[in-house]
Design a protein with these regions (language model features):
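Extracytoplasmic copper-binding redox domains, predominantly the cupredoxin/blue-copper superfamily
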Residues: 1-75
Length: 75
């Protein structure tokens, strides 16, 4: 996924783990997760999808690798 992605409300984003390690998708920042989105651990070759229904900018990161982050812009 690019570090920034623009979508329209009610569109779904799918994260695909193309890595051998586990990852998560968590909205907010490492020191202040916002509780809106918290995936389980995503294993290698697995996918996680989420539909963004509201407009806004949603920062996300991986709880296991907090330097892996991005922003979904919904407008």
């Amino acid at each position: 996924l690019p570090t920034q992605l623009s979508i329209k409300p009610h569109e779904t984003v799918t994260w695909i783990n193309e890595d051998r390690g586990f990852h998560t998708v968590t909205t907010g920042y490492y020191d202040t997760p916002d509780g809106m989105l918290e995936s389980d651990q995503i294993a290698a070759s697995e996918k996680f999808s989420f539909t963004f229904n509201e407009s806004g900018e949603f920062h996300y990161y991986c709880r296991l690798h907090p330097w892996m982050e991005g922003t979904i812009i919904v407008s």
